[in-house]
Amino acid sequence: MKVLYDDDVNTNVLENKTIAVIGYGSQGRGQSLNMHDSGLNVIVGLREGGKSWKKAQEDGLTVKTIEDASKEADIIHILIPDEIQKTVYENQIQQYVEPGNTISFSHGYNIHFNRIRVPEDVNVTMIAPKAPGSKVRQTYQEGFGTPGLIAIEQDATGDAYDIAIEMAKAVGLTRAGVIETTYREETETDLFGEQAVLCGGLTGLIQAGFETLVEAGYKPEMAYFETCHEMKLIVDLIYEKGFGNMWHDVSNTAEFGGLTRRDRVITEESKENMKKILREIQDGTFATEFAVDADTSYPKLLTQRRLEGEKQIEKVGKNLRIACGLQKEE
């Protein structure tokens, strides 16, 4: 695996290009400001008059409607939520895309699942920071950066790679290291990580552990500390130096118990279910399910969101964080 750094970027193809960043959420703001501060010609495309419009102007950026920004740009970097990208692209962007332009994303979802179809005479690239937009901005301002990915789905002009790696450098990604991937690999692994581990598996594991202790008669506050609050301590150890570092830093009791009991929690059946989740991502089942929910005003998502908010662990956690000074009382 080759990791690309600042010294590996030796081209200057963006010098006379205009980059329109569509959206000014977490990634939109972080990437726009970093590219602007790196000397690139950046404009932001937004809905006129919204909160983001004013914020981008206050940040010193040139702001235009999505249509006007797309019309003016050589590179259109789409950073609005996945579920609205297709509609915005079809209604406000695609009529202004010209041969030789570049359409760029930070997640491959809509290209990989063919929800957005770009003409063959247009580049399709990706620059994907592996951090939230606020962290992308913070580390850039500190003189460093965050790791990231680049991918080329369509190279119509012969210099799509140079465009992507230069954008990655301007965002600050090559300061930390960039890996080249594909739209398929980025999309499928990203969705799997979210569903089976980071957002789905981990939260399910924490909640099941909490409920097990409470149902056995232990105080909910103790259950929260032991199954949720301390999770950050363990994750930080793994993040910094890997699993070996974590095992080294915990007690022998914790290490022995963890290594001899974990296979009874995450079983072969768990792994088979992970494989099923991956297949549903690969064959488009998940993308279809999400699109149907989005197109009908999110009945499934809103129900799940409400149920999550009603869980005991949420109420206990909030009260503890406020009591310990970790969260301000609303």
Curated annotation (Swiss-Prot):
Mg(2+) 2 binds at D190, E226, E230. The keyword Protein transport does not apply. It catalyses: (2R)-2,3-dihydroxy-3-methylbutanoate + NADP(+) = (2S)-2-acetolactate + NADPH + H(+); (2R,3R)-2,3-dihydroxy-3-methylpentanoate + NADP(+) = (S)-2-ethyl-2-hydroxy-3-oxobutanoate + NADPH + H(+). One of its GO terms (biological process) is L-valine biosynthetic process. Keywords: Amino-acid biosynthesis, Branched-chain amino acid biosynthesis, Magnesium, Metal-binding, NADP, Oxidoreductase. Residues 182-327 form the KARI C-terminal knotted domain. NCBIfam families: ilvC (TIGR00465), PRK05479.1 (NF004017). This is Ketol-acid reductoisomerase (NADP(+)). The lineage of its organism: Archaea, Methanobacteriati, Methanobacteriota, Methanomada group, Methanobacteria.
